[in-house]
A protein has these predicted regions:
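Hydrophobic transmembrane alpha-helical segments of multi-pass transport and channel proteins
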Residues: 216-224, 251-259
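Short helical (or helix-break) motifs at transmembrane helix termini and adjacent helical loops
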Residues: 146-157, 222-234
C-alpha cells in the first residue's frame, strides 16, 4: 500500500509539472506514455508471441506513433493526422502480406487496435492542453477518470451491494459506479467554482455547469474503458499490463480510464475555444 501511495504521488507530481508547462514537456511525456502503453498492449494481445524482440508489425506501430505525434506537434490539421493513422495501419498490413504466413490476421488486428486505442486516444491529453485556457481545461480529463475511480472505490466500499460486472470485475458495484459518476461531477463543479472565485479565468455562472457535465459524462466512459482493459487482461490471463509504476502495474493499468475520457472531453471543449463560451 505504501509503495502504491508513493508511486501515485510521484506520478501526480510528474503530471502536474508536465501539464503546467505544456509544450514540449507534455508532448514528450505523452509520447513516452503512448509508446509504453502500445508495447504493453501488443505483448498482452500476443502480437509479439514468443519472439524476444519486437515483431515487424510492432516496429511499424512504433514508427507510426512517432510519425503521428510529429504531425500533432507541427500542425493542428486532422487531415495529416488521419493520413498518419491510415499509413500506419496499411504498413502493418504490408508486413503481414510480405511475410505471410509468419503472422496471423488476429495479430495484425490486435496491433492496429493497440495503435488506435492507446497512442491515438491518449494524444488528446496534449491536444486539450493546447486549447485556449488548456492549462485549466486539461485537468477535467483527470477529474472525470481518476476522480471517478477514487469516488467509485470509496462509495463501493461503503455501500456496494449489487455487482456491476460479476464475471469481468467482481469487486465493482453498481452503487460504486453511480457514486463515481456523481463524485466526478461534483469535483468538476467544485473545480469550476474554485476557478471562478479565484478569478483566474472568465467563466460565467451558466458555464459553471459545463464542467460537471463534462466530468460526469467522462466518468461514465472512464468506467467503460476500465472494464474494457480488464476484459483484455482476463482474455489473455494476465494480472497487470506491466510493472513500470510500482503498486499500480503498467501504463495501461493506470491510464485505462483516461484513454477514453480524453478524446470525449476534447471534442466538447474544442467546440468552445474559450471558457466563457462553454
Amino acid at each position: 500500500m505504501l509503495t502504491r501511495l508513493i508511486s501515485g504521488i510521484l506520478l501526480l507530481i510528474i503530471l502536474a509539472f508536465a501539464m503546467s508547462n505544456g509544450g514540449i514537456v507534455l508532448y514528450a511525456l505523452t509520447l513516452f506514455i503512448s509508446l509504453v502503453g502500445f508495447s504493453e498492449l501488443v505483448k498482452a494481445t500476443n502480437v509479439r508471441k514468443e519472439e524476444k524482440k519486437p515483431s515487424g508489425i510492432e516496429i511499424v506501430g512504433y514508427l507510426g506513433i512517432v510519425a503521428y505525434y510529429i504531425v500533432r506537434y507541427l500542425t493542428d490539421s486532422d487531415t495529416y493526422a488521419l493520413l498518419a493513422i491510415i499509413l500506419t495501419i496499411m504498413g502493418m498490413m504490408l508486413v503481414y502480406v510480405l511475410t505471410f504466413p509468419k503472422y496471423h490476421a488476429q495479430q495484425v488486428m490486435s496491433a492496429g487496435f493497440s495503435f488506435l486505442y492507446c497512442p491515438v486516444l491518449l494524444s488528446y491529453i496534449y491536444m486539450t492542453r493546447n486549447l485556449t485556457q488548456g492549462i485549466f481545461l486539461v485537468w477535467l480529463i483527470f477529474s472525470a477518470s481518476w476522480g471517478c475511480d477514487t469516488c467509485a472505490y470509496a462509495v463501493g466500499k461503503l455501500l456496494g451491494k449489487h455487482k456491476l460486472a460479476p464475471v469481468l470485475s467482481p469487486k465493482k458495484s453498481i452503487e460504486g459506479a453511480v457514486g463515481g459518476v456523481a463524485g466526478a461531477a461534483l469535483i468538476g463543479f467544485l473545480y469550476a467554482w474554485g476557478l471562478q472565485k479565484a478569478g483566474v479565468t472568465a467563466i460565467s455562472d451558466d458555464a459553471i455547469w459545463a464542467f460537471p457535465l463534462i466530468s460526469g459524462v467522462g466518468a461514465v466512459l472512464s468506467q467503460l474503458g476500465d472494464l474494457a482493459a480488464s476484459g483484455i487482461k482476463r482474455d489473455h490471463n494476465i494480472k497487470d499490463y506491466g510493472r513500470l509504476i510500482p503498486g499500480h502495474g503498467g501504463i495501461m493499468d493506470r491510464f485505462d480510464s483516461v484513454i477514453v475520457t480524453a478524446p470525449v472531453s476534447y471534442t466538447h471543449l474544442r467546440a468552445h475555444e474559450t471558457l466563457s463560451d462553454l
